[in-house]
């Protein structure tokens, strides 16, 4: 089998491809990310940037204490982030644990949120430590319950041990289960990958295996979505597009808590992958607290006053 005509899926083919990738210039990546982080957006464009960021949020609750009531409240906010202003866009998705998918999907449909997808974390999130049978069942259960997006985690131990074929095969199998029913986001847990070179390699590995999105982190490990890491991933999707004519999305998650952070991410996207990626179809932000700050800043632009942070 050929994957984009670049590898055949074997361990030797994957190693040959990945080991030929150019190394990441650490100083250069960090300097460029820092430089782009100083870019400001004109006041006339700030409302657009804030609303674009809102539309890209994967509104998330992934806590052991999650309840059906909490998930329904999250869905209400996802559809109408500001109940007093119907012009505020809905978010990109609601992201929950497997057992909350049906509750989220049913409630979204009941409140006029059919357009908001439900994303489910899968494959023994957040550790990824389980048998393939468990990971497959985890994913199938989520899709059967109504998940339209699957956020799977890779086996970081296998990747760091150089077992690229094992990681690749797991992604391929989960992608097969998703089929045309669900988009697949592949979580790397970049805080455990040690080097930017590893981030670049795993980005290509996931894209070759069929990922629709590549995602930085579970949000459970720090550091998470640092600007240099996101930059490296955006460079990877840009270059992969040049190779294959296939656009892959990027989802930073973890540590993006305010509007300033979100706008920095949009600048990174625009200046690295390009403006085509400035859409929820190709860029998402995994967050829980971020939405409140985006709404506060949007109201400040409109009225000159801050609203309550407890939107």
Where is each model-derived feature located?
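Alpha/beta enzyme core
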Residues: 44-52, 65-89, 99-251, 257-288, ...
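Charged, compositionally biased N-terminal leader segments and the immediate start
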Residues: 1-54
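A short, histidine- and acid-enriched strand-loop-helix "catalytic/donor-clamping" loop
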Residues: 62
């Amino acid at each position: 089998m050929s994957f984009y005509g670049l590898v055949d899926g074997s361990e030797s083919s994957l190693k040959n491809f990945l080991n030929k990738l150019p190394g990441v210039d650490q100083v250069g990546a960090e300097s460029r990310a820092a430089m782009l982080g100083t870019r400001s957006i004109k006041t006339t464009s700030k409302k657009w940037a804030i609303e674009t960021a809102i539309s890209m949020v994967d509104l998330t609750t992934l806590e052991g204490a999650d309840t059906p009531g909490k998930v329904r409240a999250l869905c209400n906010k996802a559809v109408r982030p500001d109940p007093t202003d119907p012009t505020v866009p809905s978010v990109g998705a609601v992201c929950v644990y497997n057992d909350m998918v049906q509750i989220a999907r049913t409630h979204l449909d009941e409140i006029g949120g059919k357009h908001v997808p439900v994303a489910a974390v899968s494959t023994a999130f957040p550790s990824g430590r389980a048998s393939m049978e468990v990971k497959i069942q985890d994913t199938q259960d989520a899709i059967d319950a109504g998940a339209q997006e699957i956020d799977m985690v890779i086996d970081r131990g296998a990747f760091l041990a150089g077992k690229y074929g094992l990681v690749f095969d797991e992604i391929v199998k989960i992608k097969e289960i998703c089929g045309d029913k669900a988009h697949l986001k592949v979580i790397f847990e970049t805080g455990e990958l040690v080097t930017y070179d590893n981030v670049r390699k795993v980005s290509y590995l996931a894209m070759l295996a069929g990922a629709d999105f590549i995602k930085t982190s579970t949000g459970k490990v720090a550091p998470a979505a640092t600007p240099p890491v996101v930059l490296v991933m955006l460079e990877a999707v840009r270059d992969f597009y040049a190779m294959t004519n296939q656009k892959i999305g990027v989802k930073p998650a973890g540590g993006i808590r305010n509007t300033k952070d979100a706008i920095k991410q949009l600048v990174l996207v625009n200046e690295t992958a390009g403006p085509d990626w400035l859409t929820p179809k190709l860029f998402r932000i995994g967050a829980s607290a971020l939405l409140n700050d985006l709404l506060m800043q949007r109201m400040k632009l409109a009225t000159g006053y801050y609203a309550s942070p407890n939107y």
